[in-house]
UniProtKB/Swiss-Prot annotation:
Pathway: Amino-acid biosynthesis; L-phenylalanine biosynthesis; phenylpyruvate from prephenate: step 1/1
GO terms under cellular component: cytoplasm
The ACT domain, residue ranges: 204-281
This protein's name: Prephenate dehydratase
Keyword Transferase: no
Organism (species): Mycolicibacterium smegmatis (strain ATCC 700084 / mc(2)155) (Mycobacterium smegmatis)
InterPro entries (alphabetical): ACT-like_dom_sf, ACT_dom, Chor_mutase/pphenate_deHydtase, Preph_deHydtase, Preph_deHydtase_CS
Gene label: pheA
Stored Pfam families: ACT, PDT
Recorded catalytic activity of this chain's protein: prephenate + H(+) = 3-phenylpyruvate + CO2 + H2O
Site (Essential for activity): 183
Assembly and oligomerization: Homodimer.
Keyword Metal-binding in record: no
Keywords recorded for this protein, A-Z: Amino-acid biosynthesis, Aromatic amino acid biosynthesis, Lyase, Phenylalanine biosynthesis
Prephenate dehydratase domain: residues covered: 3-190
Length: 310
């Protein structure tokens, strides 16, 4: 069975996303392994990706973007640094928190354990319902449940899965300040053959550009002239020199789509470095698909054959 690394302990949203990926058959591998995996729990998202690079895991399930705070920067930075990795699948998870307490607790809540990101996403609920409680930081959403179970906090901002695993009572469910909060998770492994194109795919690259005027515009032109829909552009410092950046690009389409393949070849010629992060199916169309070039290819072949393009 595949070994899959993810942020632990048991009960995190990442584990919930991974369980759905496995149940939906999104993990590459032999048919006899379908539905099973060996968990490799780590103490951070970069740690999960390091487990893949070091051979301690076959894949890692990590968050890459959420609707409240945007891109998960530790994931981006870890994908861009170190030996190459590749994304094979993605899944979007609805995120709502569960306020947990120890069984039978009916006294005052003086302390609430919360992962800082979670605390920020439920701060209005906490102010309205537990305004006198002190928020104490937890290592993860699941760790908040463990803090409650082990008596380090009266209540915790956690997940339903963690409440079940730790045997805790639910004080409040589906807690979130912003409706429709969602997080996108990706399955990452070592470089290999991408999943087949489906017509609803995403391709991602990291670009390092020549430090000269117009370099970014020139790179973007390779997509625009081919009618490729860019769905995300983000810059991050290279961490090598002040004022130098690398650029993360997502586009609709697959490396097997001719326009995307041509754009990647052009970027390889133009850029200092192009790191391919993969082409993989999305749950729904991520932007307009790239145009088909079948008619144009037939026309060109006719010219080469001397038919005058007729």
């Amino acid at each position: 069975m595949p070994r899959i690394a993810y942020l632990g302990p048991e009960g995190t949203f990442t584990e919930a996303a991974l369980l759905q990926m496995v149940a939906k058959g999104m993990v590459p591998g032999p048919a006899e392994d379908a539905g099973g995996f060996t968990p490799v729990r780590t103490d951070s998202t970069p740690g999960a990706l390091s487990a893949v690079r070091e051979g301690r895991a076959d894949y890692a399930c990590v968050p890459i973007e959420n609707s409240i705070d945007g891109t998960v920067l530790p994931t981006l930075d870890s994908l861009a640094a170190g030996s190459p990795l590749q994304i094979y699948a993605e899944l979007t998870l609805d995120v709502a928190f569960t306020i947990v307490v120890r069984p039978g607790h009916d006294g005052p809540v003086r302390t609430v354990a919360a992962f800082p990101v979670a605390a920020a996403q439920v701060r209005h609920w906490l102010a309205a319902n537990l305004r006198d409680a002190e928020v104490v930081p937890a290592h993860s959403n699941a760790a908040a449940a463990h803090d409650v179970a082990e008596g380090r906090a009266d209540a915790g901002v956690s997940t339903r899965l963690a409440a079940e695993r730790c045997g805790l009572d639910i004080m409040a469910a589906d807690v979130v300040d912003e409706p429709n909060a969602r997080t996108r998770f990706v399955l990452v492994g070592l470089p290999g053959t991408p999943p087949p194109a489906t017509g609803a795919d995403r391709t991602a690259v990291v670009l390092r550009l020549v430090n000269e005027p117009g370099a970014l515009v020139s790179a973007m032109t390779e997509f625009s002239i081919r009618d490729i829909d860019l769905t995300r552009i983000e810059s991050r410092p290279t961490r090598t020199e002040l004022g130098t950046y690398m650029f993360f690009l997502d586009c609709a389409g697959h490396i097997d789509d001719d326009p995307v393949a041509e754009a990647l070849k052009a970027l390889h010629r133009r850029c200092v470095d192009v790191r391919y992060l993969g082409s993989w199916p999305t749950e729904s169309a991520a932007g307009a698909p790239p145009p088909r070039l079948d008619e144009a290819t037939t026309w060109l072949e006719g010219l080469r054959a001397g038919s005058g393009g007729a």
